Amino acid sequence: YSSAASDVYKRQFNRSARDNIMYGNPNATEKDLIRSSRQAEAHEFIQDLEDHRGRKGYDAHLGEQGVKLSGGQRQRIALARAILKDSPVLVLDEATSALDSEVENSIQNALELVMENKTVLAIAHRLSTLAKMDRIIVLSDGQIVEEGTHKKLLKINGLYRQYWDKQSGGFITTEQAAE
């Protein structure tokens, strides 16, 4: 059994960007490292990194718990690590919470490929992260109150639908989102 988690803050080390990502799979090749970084939308900003000792790109150190990175950058490093690990079980804990909408959309598209043929446990308050999942379980006060696909949950007009309507803010109709 093997799993990968996109645990954003607690697993960033004061090591290089390369070491932080390769932690997911120490035997991975440089090509694998770059591929996973690109899929996580991290490659571009990693290339621009420079630490206080002049180390650049993938060799730049990130600081303790990734302190030198933004929340979104830390998230993308953690996602790159999870992608590189390529486990049959993937745990996404608020995987897109610190990302702007454009990067979130790109990562969601990449995650669709990564999640294929895997068991994914996704914890999310941003419901757009869950919309393409095969099965969504809605919890309230520690109890399962609804379950189904995004489309089914929108139709039953319950708690999930209420949250979806609040988050979509009327920019798109619920019917458009269900298509």
Regions found by a protein language model. Give the residues of each.
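Short loop/turn and capping residues at structural boundaries
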Residues: 48-51, 73, 141, 164-165
